[in-house]
Amino acid sequence: MTSKPTQDRHRAKRLALSDPDEALRLARDIEDHWFRCQALALVAFRCESDTLRATAITESFQAGWELGAVNRVVVASSWPLKVLCKKGGAERLEDEVRRLLAIIDTDRSPVRRAESLDFVLGALITAPRELFWQAYEQLEEACRAPLHGGKRNVKGEALLVQWMPVLHAFDPARAEAALAAIQGPVLAERARATIAQNPSVNPEKWIPRPSLD
């Protein structure tokens, strides 16, 4: 059975075009911070009023902040961040990227940092390229960072492999450099095969997270 927060998020999304004020009210009333953050972002993405959109984005980031744990704050905030990318607001986008990257940097776990940055980078696929690469550099660092006791970060390397077709589409030379640094030959070969099989990849379809659908 679908939970009430999930149902209310879907209802708010559906109402955003036909009754944006009611959609905003419904999204605001969701008690769960995670679902409220997403619902407000979905309303912001679909509504036609610039004023209402700006309000919903601000409240969405606030709901994300209220989650407390660094990785949950950042992952949830990737939803309103993606709305900023898709609907304009370049100056605010830069401010929010700077804020979120600073928050991520406080997490000592490279695994959690990589998981958070994966969503941030997904939100920034349509952003100005310099912002994308700024987030990517932190993702790459987290994915390559050794785990406790110096263990190889296999999970991080596997995440980088997922991003290789997008990197290759944006900057083939940078993708090659990233491939060369992957320690595992099996993962590196998988990445090369994925790139070869998807020469004209659509970055947004390849990495759909966070989803605004």
Question: Residue ranges of each PLM-predicted region?
Answer:
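Non-catalytic tandem-repeat scaffold regions and their flanking low-complexity/translocation tails
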Residues: 1-213
